[in-house]
Curated annotation (Swiss-Prot):
Forms a stable non-covalent complex with prematurely activated/folded SspB. The keyword Transferase does not apply. Keywords: Cytoplasm, Protease inhibitor, Thiol protease inhibitor, Virulence. This is Staphostatin B. GO terms for molecular function: cysteine-type endopeptidase inhibitor activity. The keyword Transmembrane helix does not apply. Residues 97-101 are annotated as: Binds to staphopain B. Transmembrane segments: none annotated. Belongs to the protease inhibitor I57 (SspC) family. It comes from Staphylococcus aureus (strain MRSA252). The gene is sspC.
Length: 109
């Protein structure tokens, strides 16, 4: 059975540059790692009170975003854009102690 994680990125588009918005949009969609049986659904919006995450940092040069949950700000998630079909996701602590190995996700069509 697949583990499914919903990530609702909450941000104010009026405070972001066009390049930052484009960078975020690279990650929007449904992604899966078949080997680990994990799927993630990344979207923009605050139309739900569940699974809300706020963006901490947008690195447009490396196509990377860092974000954390409204419920647990101690865990930081890092998304790296690999290509149109793959992203990498890893976690870290807010204190920077330890970082998980990146998990590769493939875009679901």
């Amino acid at each position: 059975m697949y583990q499914l994680q919903f990530i609702n990125l909450v941000y104010d588009t009026t405070k972001l540059t066009h390049l930052e918005q484009t960078n975020i949009n690279l990650f929007i969609g449904n992604w899966s790692n078949h080997q680990l049986q994990k799927s993630i659904c990344i979207r923009h919006g605050d139309d739900t009170s569940h699974n809300q995450y706020h963006i901490l940092f947008i690195d447009t040069a490396h196509q990377r975003i860092k974000f954390s949950s409204f419920d647990n700000e101690e865990i930081i998630y890092i998304l790296d854009y690999d290509d149109t079909q793959h992203i990498l996701m890893q976690t870290s602590s807010k204190q920077g102690i330890g970082t998980s190995r990146p998990i590769v996700y493939e875009r679901l069509v």
